[in-house]
Amino acid sequence: MTEEMNVVETSSEMNSNVEKASTQVKETKKFERRTRPQSKSKQVKDEFEEKVVTIRRVTKVTKGGRHFRFAAVVVVGNKKGLVGMGTGKANEVPEAIKKAIKEAKKNLVSVTLRNTTVPHEVLGTFGAGKILIKPAKVGTGIIAGGPARAVIELAGISDVYAKSLGSNNAINMIRATFEGLSSMQTLKRVQELRYGKTFDTQKVKPVEQKVAEVKGVEKKQPKQAVKKVAVKKAENQENRVEVITNAETESKAE
């Protein structure tokens, strides 16, 4: 009997321990934070690089006194033709930069590239800011200064000339570069807008090639054709001589 009682007690203790463990697991599951897989938009946004252009202190004057805050201007890009700019204000610098990055990722602009440079020359304007952008050869590098350099680098352009012709305000310069880069178009796009259809640039032969082909055809003409042309010229000259002699004889007879 004593052995049976001991077995019953041990089994009851085991059951109670199992119940306690199950309740603990349930409680921990309630407070566990669910981790969801990252969306594609977050994964794409992580590819962007950031550059802080300016950080300045701003003040707001009220009846109670002056309130100081920090304003940051940040440029974001993936170096593959996507660039964005954003501004942010906060009581501390890191918070202002975070706000600016968040706004820049919402205001992305696509830029048309031609290998490592831009397709053509363009003048971007915004307010009093003006910037001239020109294409350059491979190996030239980025010849630009100020806020425009950050925009050009993060856009993926590595060979370009840029010159500021207007205001030196950072925001105006950045917006002027955005206006200039976004207005650029490739040759195919211009042809589509003008004629409503695309052309294969490979099929269109340059003028020099056409001239060379024409010269080659002239050289390859057979000798018989040249002889026929010479005979026709001689016959025409004889006919002219006969007409002239007939006219002279008629005038003498009169």
Swiss-Prot record:
Keywords: Ribonucleoprotein, Ribosomal protein, RNA-binding, rRNA-binding. One of its GO terms (biological process) is translation. Belongs to the universal ribosomal protein uS5 family. InterPro entries: Ribosomal_Su5_D2-typ_SF (IPR020568), Ribosomal_uS5 (IPR000851), Ribosomal_uS5_bac-type (IPR005712), Ribosomal_uS5_C (IPR005324), Ribosomal_uS5_N (IPR013810), Ribosomal_uS5_N_CS (IPR018192), Ribsml_uS5_D2-typ_fold_subgr (IPR014721). The N-terminal domain interacts with the head of the 30S subunit; the C-terminal domain interacts with the body and contacts protein S4. The interaction surface between S4 and S5 is involved in control of translational fidelity. It comes from Mycoplasma mycoides subsp. mycoides SC (strain CCUG 32753 / NCTC 10114 / PG1). GO terms for cellular component: small ribosomal subunit. Disulfide bonds: none annotated. One of its GO terms (molecular function) is structural constituent of ribosome. Residues 48-111 form the S5 DRBM domain. Part of the 30S ribosomal subunit. Contacts proteins S4 and S8. Residues 8-25 have a biased composition (Polar residues). With S4 and S12 plays an important role in translational accuracy. Pfam families: Ribosomal_S5 (PF00333), Ribosomal_S5_C (PF03719). This is Small ribosomal subunit protein uS5. Residues 1-45 are annotated as: Disordered. It comes from the Bacteria. SUPFAM superfamilies: dsRNA-binding domain-like, Ribosomal protein S5 domain 2-like.
